[in-house]
């Protein structure tokens, strides 16, 4: 998972590592504290740190743009853009790690004793880019089961994995949705939306409906690819449109 992330995001892998460490130890601190007020403060610190980092990379330049537009009208000096590169999967691994910490805070989950186990959960590569977001109480038991068997047994389980055929089939449907539906609809929709004044109302309505189909096929396709890849590895992750 970390190799995949480093290959696509290079040094921004530091953010994934920070999010993992941040949530792992703050969840432990929440679990170890019996003081309700302290637990709440730790959770707030976690939320501010995690969401603040996400907001910085996703919305900093948007905020600067709005400020500069206002500054231009009132005669204030504009501030330079940060031009931050958006790390791949930052929304998904941020919310996935937060869901773990919040579940610990609510008493629904006992914090993981193993940092490697938690890191694997946060960075599980099939769904790192486009989800679906995993819940720790669904995923960690599967991981622990596989960690408690020998390497030989694990290899045999993967070879004779009854979900292998199903996983490949789901991935194939995902690629079909993405490549044959979403990618072929996109140019047509973009052409209409780029110059809507040149088209009649009926065409614009059809393009709007087609855009909805494009978004569904694109997102659903990525999700199916993730679910299928996870099944091939022996993990079951939730259907995103049933458990968003």
Model-predicted segments: where are they?
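Membrane-embedded transmembrane alpha-helical bundles that form the catalytic cores
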Residues: 1-244
